[in-house]
Amino acid sequence: MVKMLVLYYSAYGHMEQMAKAAAEGAREGGAEITLKRVPELVPEEVAKASHYKIDQEAPIATPGELADYDAIIIGTATRYGMMASQMKNFLDQTGGLWAKGALINKVGSVMVSTATQYGGAELALISTQWQMQHHGMIIVPLSYAYREQMGNDVVRGGAPYGMTTTADGDGSRQPSAQELDGARFQGRRVAEITAKLHG
């Protein structure tokens, strides 16, 4: 059975919802799932004052455990068109894994959330994939296999590189049913492709 980690950073809970949906989809695809988050770097008093969602139930991951999985889906909030510093800080601690080639031929996939539709989602998706590529991971994108990302009738998440959601500047917009469905699709797709590669 494929062992998959869904690893995320979420300040306000949007990516937490997407990560849970991706985990559901991966389970449907036959994977054994672990859902974890990266440590918060913002001081607790600042996080509380900024109304961060600090009661997230997922346990905190450690960089060394990434080698234990066949596939890793990273979900991250974005800051100025890049992954959030919390996720970058976590990935910057994986140099030991890189030196050992511990993630070579593992499967990787990425999802992001942004404040606006044009808030750098595609750049954040691709630049997070770069981190995985430096580790020798095999990238499995959302791709246009997920057809529900097409159309302009409503705000829709998704890009060929990975699933996206938009939160609005004040965080008031929650992931839509379509976006959660896309996250489930991506999780299932990663699980099924990983099973073919590692089965």
Swiss-Prot record:
Listed Gene3D superfamilies: 3.40.50.360
Entry GO CC: membrane
Binding site for NAD(+): 12
Catalytic activity, reaction form: a quinone + NADH + H(+) = a quinol + NAD(+); a quinone + NADPH + H(+) = a quinol + NADP(+)
UniProt cofactor(s): FMN
The Flavodoxin-like domain, residue ranges: 4-190
Coiled-coil ranges (or none): none
Feature: compositional bias, Polar residues: 163-177
HAMAP family: NQOR
PANTHER family tied to this protein: FLAVODOXIN-RELATED PROTEIN WRBA-RELATED, FLAVOPROTEIN-LIKE PROTEIN YCP4-RELATED
Protein name, UniProt field: NAD(P)H dehydrogenase (quinone)
